Regions:
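Core of compact, soluble alpha-helical bundle domains
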Residues: 1-133
Length: 133
């Protein structure tokens, strides 16, 4: 029996499923869980709602996110291993739930965002006086 094809990411319910499933994995991850849970604490509902808006804006043009996503991450105790694990979990979640052009866009955007965050966090740590978000 052939498995049913997965849908592409098309509407807000898909964004909620992606974000909630992904962050469920992050919260329970041996490497990432303590960091995220320690910083977010009991504010997970608010964080998830913000991530729904962020990924909804990035992937399906909802236009509901405003903010600067890099700023909250600058002082987090994270490095290459953390970004690598974040990407593993994100890509696995996308692939478990979806397939299609927007799912591929999610992969590309996550890769670009992780690369940019790592580069800017490193610049901020080594030369904060020169840092421009």
């Amino acid at each position: 029996m052939t498995p049913a094809p997965r849908a592409d990411i098309r509407h807000h319910d898909h964004i909620v499923l992606l974000v909630d499933t992904f962050y469920g994995k992050v919260r329970n991850d041996d490497l990432l869980g303590a960091i995220f849970n320690g910083i977010i604490g009991d504010r997970w509902p608010e964080h998830l709602e913000k991530m729904h808006r962020f990924w909804g804006t990035v992937l399906i043009n909802e236009g509901s996110y405003t903010g600067t996503p890099l700023r909250p991450h600058l002082d987090m105790p994270i490095g290459a291993a953390h970004f690598g694990r974040w990407l593993q979990l994100f890509h696995a979640t996308v692939d478990e739930l979806f397939e299609g052009p927007v799912a591929q866009l999610a992969h590309r955007n996550a890769d670009r965002m992780a690369d940019m965050f790592q580069e800017r966090i490193e610049r901020y740590r080594t030369r904060p006086q020169d840092f421009i978000q």
